[in-house]
Amino acid sequence: MFEIIQAVFSAGVALALLTFAGITLGGSVVACIISTPLFVIFSPVLVPATIATTLLASGFTASGSFGATAFTILSWLYKKRTGRDLPKIPGLTPPAPASNPAGSGV
């Protein structure tokens, strides 16, 4: 009985989601039909604005990344020079070999 209820509920949800998908697709087509003439009219402004915005965002991202990398390297160099190494991550390096191996019998 539980499987029947589950199947009916799943079919109802699937039907509702398909209905929403169809409504969304129809709305997207109507919006595309309405907005296409506006994009054609304003394209001499929109295309350069898009290019400028993309270049500006890429420049800020690259600048921030280079600055963060440089700061990390300078911080590492300073800690190396002053003898204050970063704490080691446990388990990252293998443990040192034992001075008395198990098979030596000593």
UniProtKB/Swiss-Prot annotation:
Residues 84-106 are annotated as: Disordered. This is Tapetal oleosin GRP-19. It is found in: Secreted, Extracellular space, Extracellular matrix, Pollen coat; Lipid droplet; Membrane. GO terms for molecular function: lipid binding. The chain crosses the membrane at residues 14-34, 37-57, 58-78. It is a multi-pass membrane protein. Lipid-binding oleosin involved in anther tapetum development, especially for the physiology of tapetosomes. Also implicated in the formation of pollen coat.
